[in-house]
Amino acid sequence: QGWSENPREALIHNLPQGDLLILDLFAECRPKWGIASIFQNDEGYGQHQWLYCMLENFGGNVGLHGRMDQLLNNFYQTQTNPKAAHLKGIGFTMEGSENNPVMFELMSELPWRPTKFGKEEWLKGYVRARYGTNDPTLQEAWQLLGATIYNCPMGNNQQGPHESIFCGRPSANNFQASSWSKMSNYYDPDDILRAATLFF
């Protein structure tokens, strides 16, 4: 797996090409295959085959969250970057499912689209397919979600949706449950409330 320091170069260097398939576990946020990130490996995976994976969900936490722009930008950089020469497909490495289906739909389309597309246009088709109609109110709601809560920005290493403070240690200023997770509003909560009202 491509995560943090793994796989170490000394471990995989002498393995024959084709004997290893590496999953770049968090490629939508912390790609290890060669582009800038806190997990970056300057040499990518060398001669080894690998999959561009979306982690999206940590610990089965339920809540709205996604990185649409990063998912698209990072994936389409593989088309022209020589470090990605041995990319063989995509993978899903989530620690929980049954949430944020829009992100899984978007990820699933990537191998079928040879040229980069914008999330705004893609969301229009997603709404038509999901609801069987081109309702302007639903379109507005999803465009708002795609620009806010489903668009965690580059540089924000938050691991999925906000954690419940009820799961954290008792404290007067508790804002998260895990010590390693970054919890901050990268969107305006009022935009999410507005989007929610558009669904009714």
Per-region residue spans from a language model:
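Catalytic-core regions of glycoside hydrolase
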Residues: 1-146, 151-159, 167-189, 194
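Short, intrinsically disordered, charge-balanced linker/junction segments flanking boundaries
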Residues: 197-200
